[in-house]
Regions:
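Rossmann-fold NAD(P)H-dependent dehydrogenase/reductase core
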Residues: 2-225
């Protein structure tokens, strides 16, 4: 039985672990779990790349991290997962600057937002939560392989139980849009992606995991009502 539970903190999970010399890239670092991951991992010596869509919010998050972890090794970069052009530009810049990546934390996401599409025409939740990360991870695969043993952690959710993938209409073009169905589908995609990525790359030293973070009040739930 796991010794961790609903009250377990990030610091308790990382007790006794040294991340000195490790480089960790976190998407969605400007708030919530991304910001907390940056704080906890930097406190253990990791060099953190904080990647987020809004540079000002990312700067504010980094300032909060540095207040708690003086001397934290933080690098801030702009990444918009709703734009494949942005993802490609981000990956190109990262690979040019960094020959090593030990951990990729695919954390950024949206939940239960109104119907919409990304700049590339994908349904917003599937496009942001899965497709953007799918491309990012693929583009960074060479540096992950060069840095092996390395790992990819994909933030999925127990919401994957809501629905599987509707491969006939993944973008809700021929059915009524339901924000929970769309969110659940994106989380199923996250989980399936991590499983297949691990199957393909584990023997080469890149492990992939999908995780359910639990019910945590963060900015992710901004589209939900109080109930």
């Amino acid at each position: 039985m796991s010794r961790y539970g609903a009250d377990t903190t990030t610091d308790e999970v990382l007790e006794g672990i040294d991340f000195s010399g490790k480089r960790v890239l976190i998407t969605g670092s400007s708030s919530g779990l991304g910001e907390e991951s940056a704080r906890a991992l930097s406190a253990k010596g990791a060099a953190i790349i904080m990647a987020a869509r809004d540079p000002q919010k990312n700067e504010a998050a980094a300032a909060r991290v540095r207040e708690k972890v003086p001397g934290a090794d933080l690098e801030l970069r702009t990444l918009d997962l709703c734009s494949l052009e942005s993802v490609r530009g981000f990956a190109k810049g990262f690979l040019a600057d960094h020959p090593r990546l030990d951990v990729l934390l695919d954390n950024a996401g949206v939940m239960c937002c109104p119907r919409g599409t990304t700049s590339d025409g994908f349904e917003t939740q599937l496009g942001t939560n899965h497709i953007g990360h799918f491309l990012l991870t693929g583009l960074l695969a060479p540096v992950l392989l060069d840095s092996a043993p390395s790992r990819v952690v994909v933030l999925s959710s127990a919401a994957h139980l809501i629905t599987g993938m509707d491969f006939d209409d993944p973008m809700f073009e021929r059915r009524d849009y339901d924000p929970w169905q769309a969110y659940g589908q994106s989380k199923t995609a996250n989980a399936l992606f991590a499983l297949e990525l691990d199957r393909r790359l584990a023997e080469e030293g890149v492990s992939a995991y999908s995780v359910h973070p639990g019910r945590i009040v963060t900015e992710l739930g901004r589209h939900m009502n109080e109930e």
